[in-house]
């Protein structure tokens, strides 16, 4: 079976969406090696985090072929990519980051889309009006035409049902995994060197992520204050 991926963020994003895309491709290609995986991306950027694809016989990377698609990559990814999916005999196409191309629902290609959150609806003040309208149109289209939806949390599933009127039977909750790089055992000496270098106190909390209002860090800190000493 040939499975296609919207792999743009696997090559260009170094945070949540990129990690999800890379891990999904890496894990599937390893544990389901009999399938062929085709990664569709506007640009094949040099990315050390995608080095796992090198030497993988069941992974192929495809970029826009025609001049117009190379120049208008957003249009290619939004619509014209459907032609390339046909040319490559794709059986299943997975939109890894909230989107599916227009017109794919008119083909025989089965589709899956992963929805990470609908925060632009739940907290609209964090986004400008134009972005909210674009996101709403893209996300709703993907959820409507997809054969299957993956939600990364139960809350996201509830939001999809509530805001897009999608049947809950169409949605599967699959929590994002953790790359083994985050599970590495660090020698005690190395820990102490880092603690000394950065003057870290005895009691501390490590947060890995961007500092933004939508990350809810303020509520986290307020909760800590209420914990018993």
Cite the ranges covered by each PLM segment:
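Carbohydrate transferase catalytic cores enriched for Leloir-type hexosyltransferases
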Residues: 1-229
């Amino acid at each position: 079976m040939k499975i296609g991926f919207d792999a743009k963020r696997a090559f260009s994003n170094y945070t949540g969406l990129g990690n999800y895309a890379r891990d999904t491709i890496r894990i599937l290609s390893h544990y389901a090696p009999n399938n062929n995986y085709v990664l569709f991306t506007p640009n094949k950027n040099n990315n050390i985090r995608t080095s796992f694809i090198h030497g993988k016989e069941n992974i192929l990377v495809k970029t826009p072929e025609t001049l117009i698609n190379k120049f208008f990559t957003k249009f290619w990814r939004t619509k014209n990519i459907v032609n390339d999916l046909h040319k490559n005999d794709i059986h299943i196409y997975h939109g890894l980051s909230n989107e599916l191309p227009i017109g794919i629902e008119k083909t025989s290609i089965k589709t899956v889309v992963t929805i990470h959150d609908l925060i632009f609806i739940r907290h609209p003040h964090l986004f400008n009006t134009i972005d909210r309208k674009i996101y709403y149109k893209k996300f709703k289209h993907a959820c409507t035409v997809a054969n299957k939806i993956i939600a990364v949390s139960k809350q996201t599933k509830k939001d999809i049902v509530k805001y897009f009127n999608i049947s809950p039977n169409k949605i599967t909750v699959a929590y994002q995994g953790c790359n083994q790089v985050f599970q590495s055992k660090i020698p005690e000496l190395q820990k102490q060197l880092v603690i000394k270098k950065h003057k870290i106190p005895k009691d501390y909390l490590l947060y890995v992520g961007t500092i933004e209002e939508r990350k809810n860090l303020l509520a986290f800190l307020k909760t800590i204050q209420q914990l018993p000493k």
